[in-house]
Amino acid sequence: MAGETTKLDLSVKAVGWGAADASGVLQPIKFYRRVPGERDVKIRVLYSGVCNFDMEMVRNKWGFTRYPYVFGHETAGEVVEVGSKVEKFKVGDKVAVGCMVGSCGQCYNCQSGMENYCPEPNMADGSVYREQGERSYGGCSNVMVVDEKFVLRWPENLPQDKGVALLCAGVVVYSPMKHLGLDKPGKHIGVFGLGGLGSVAVKFIKAFGGKATVISTSRRKEKEAIEEHGADAFVVNTDSEQLKALAGTMDGVVDTTPGGRTPMSLMLNLLKFDGAVMLVGAPESLFELPAAPLIMGRKKIIGSSTGGLKEYQEMLDFAAKHNIVCDTEVIGIDYLSTAMERIKNLDVKYRFAIDIGNTLKFEE
């Protein structure tokens, strides 16, 4: 993390919610944050988003969760204190923190403005800072202390409760489309899956001036996709006639389903010459990769994970300008365990946001 290299004063008392071990039992966890340094911003957390990633981290699915674990990589709040050299923010500003709270700042990726691909990142929930050895704890807590570089300005006309999930779902789909030039009017983009990521992807595509076609496993969400989210068309992925008619018509396809579930051949067949498949769903297994469609159509497959700081801010500003928010159920902290079970059972439309400011009690 950019900033001081002296020993930190970890004396800011904090409380968050998370897990003490991989059992998945959620509970209040008391811990300490650092005293704000000269370039730090102290934030009173008001809302924290919850998604499937948090549930998997709580249970240590990938084997790198550090306990005690306080989750939260979608955080919105207000500034309550700033360091002496902070230039971007003042007390009272609405702000946000995404998936990252630090990076090396020196590598090619960081220098290119893509801090999310830094080989030594400081993630918001559970990293150890390279220089100081400080643990990071997520935003599902009463307070955060973050280097100003990694604090985002929150647009005034964007509601924090409905917008906080954009810090994950929004940037995950915005970044690859922006990178590939699919943010231009007239582009035809297919969206596989209509969950938290897919529903937001459709909203961004329409705001870009593009055509959005949702591809799903059943017609259950057809009315919702078209009437609520503005999709131009809806296709069932087993309808061979519909798929045949769409072959070679799309500039891009964004796959928001868990990686490997959607046949790659199906997605590649929908693409125009020079089209791209964007993988943003975490892969659960290996998948077959047909080479002929790639070679004969100069098609490409890219993966993407969140976005750099510049992209984060651009995404929030764009969302505010076009009134893009996530379909969100706002809950109190006491409902968190139930919310996690509902996420596991796919029983949420489409995101949860915890009202931290009004429901997380902090006692010295």
UniProtKB/Swiss-Prot annotation:
GO terms for biological process: indole alkaloid metabolic process; response to jasmonic acid; response to silver ion. Expressed in leaf epidermis. PROSITE patterns: ADH_ZINC (PS00059). Binds 2 Zn(2+) ions per subunit. It comes from the Eukaryota. Its EC number is 1.3.1.36. GO terms for molecular function: geissoschizine dehydrogenase activity; oxidoreductase activity, acting on the CH-OH group of donors, NAD or NADP as acceptor; zinc ion binding. Homodimer. Zn(2+) 1 binds at C51, H73, E74, C168. It comes from Catharanthus roseus. Zn(2+) 2 binds at C104, C107, C110, C118. Belongs to the zinc-containing alcohol dehydrogenase family. Class-III subfamily. InterPro entries: ADH-like_C, ADH-like_N, ADH_Zn_CS, CAD-like, GroES-like_sf, NAD(P)-bd_dom_sf, PKS_ER. NADP(+) binds at N52, L194, G196, L197, S216, T217, S218, K221, R261, V280, A282, S304, T306, R351. This is Geissoschizine synthase. Induction: Induced by methyl jasmonate (MeJA, MJ) and silver nitrate (AgNO(3)). Pathway: Alkaloid biosynthesis. Keywords: Alkaloid metabolism, Metal-binding, NADP, Oxidoreductase, Zinc. It catalyses: (19E)-geissoschizine + NADP(+) = 4,21-dehydrogeissoschizine + NADPH. Changing F53T: Abolished activity.
